């Protein structure tokens, strides 16, 4: 079988080393005669797995001691509801930064629980999609928190700035598609959350990193399974957690540390993205519609000037082992998601195919 490279936006590819280790351990984990999927989440074996995963994540992101790390159910969409239920307190309004599709989804859910002050930061630079810099965000004085999404997967738009607002601003960020892709100053945020299925592990588990002083403020009607204080008190095991996803995420954390950590990931991810954007920018056949300063390093959408060739491109790419390149239904075209597990060799294979396709069809 030819080498396959999976450019899916999520669930995304996992490091092959992680998959091989999971395969080796699947039926007989650490010699106990059963699978990790079959053991009790309250047994000493799994508790050790869970704690090790948390410790490795804390090391990777240098998570301060006054932050809780939670492994939750419900995905990022679950957090769209959990955030206002937990963090609104006695206020009625929260600032929501609208930079794209997923930010808008968060707003839609938040409207059930609070009054979102929607701050539209979408703009254009020389006809290319962009977002306003943080210094131009018109934040409210009376908002409970500020919510934003640093990386919009569909349009491939990224906010590369780290927040630097006044100390009384509680910043909440949806890092689902860019967590662990580079260094991150957790202390600048009140809370960070991320669905696992892009840069952490398989679908089914959600990471929440929340500052301790924000716990215990949930509305009384908040379901216990979404109450951060309840989850923290029970070490994310208020009910049976998604144990296999937790275990696999822990293997990914170990792999990241073995590779050199998030600093090394940042170098690799920039190199991969530059390789792909360079081919697009030098071509009259392909185009990317995002301003260079806001281009995502994780999700690279591109279109062909002749959109009638899209189906042919996708079919031929798939036949060569370049999978899941179809763009989101909202934006069309193509999209290459190049998360941590994607190798530079995979991106090189894609750009080689793109150059060949242009020669034959341009």
UniProtKB/Swiss-Prot annotation:
SUPFAM superfamilies: PLP-dependent transferases
Record-listed N6-(pyridoxal phosphate)lysine modification sites: 198
Cofactor binding remark: Binds 1 pyridoxal phosphate per subunit.
Alphabetical list of InterPro entries matching this protein: Aminotrans_V_dom (IPR000192), Aminotrans_V_PyrdxlP_BS (IPR020578), Pser_aminoTfrase (IPR022278), PyrdxlP-dep_Trfase (IPR015424), PyrdxlP-dep_Trfase_major (IPR015421), PyrdxlP-dep_Trfase_small (IPR015422)
Gene Ontology terms: cellular component: cytoplasm
Gene Ontology terms, MF aspect: O-phospho-L-serine:2-oxoglutarate aminotransferase activity; pyridoxal phosphate binding
Cofactor(s) required for function per UniProt: pyridoxal 5'-phosphate
Subcellular location: Cytoplasm
Pathway(s) of this molecule: Amino-acid biosynthesis; L-serine biosynthesis; L-serine from 3-phospho-D-glycerate: step 2/3; Cofactor biosynthesis; pyridoxine 5'-phosphate biosynthesis; pyridoxine 5'-phosphate from D-erythrose 4-phosphate: step 3/5
Keyword annotations: Amino-acid biosynthesis, Aminotransferase, Cytoplasm, Pyridoxal phosphate, Pyridoxine biosynthesis, Serine biosynthesis, Transferase
Protein name (Swiss-Prot/TrEMBL): Phosphoserine aminotransferase
Binding site for pyridoxal 5'-phosphate: 76-77, 102, 153, 174, 197, 239-240
Pfam families: Aminotran_5 (PF00266)
Similarity-based family: Belongs to the class-V pyridoxal-phosphate-dependent aminotransferase family. SerC subfamily.
Function text: Catalyzes the reversible conversion of 3-phosphohydroxypyruvate to phosphoserine and of 3-hydroxy-2-oxo-4-phosphonooxybutanoate to phosphohydroxythreonine.
PROSITE patterns: AA_TRANSFER_CLASS_5 (PS00595)
Binding site for L-glutamate: 9, 42
Disulphide bond pairs: none
GO biological process terms held by the UniProt record: L-serine biosynthetic process; pyridoxine biosynthetic process
EC number: 2.6.1.52
Main localization, broad class: cytoplasm
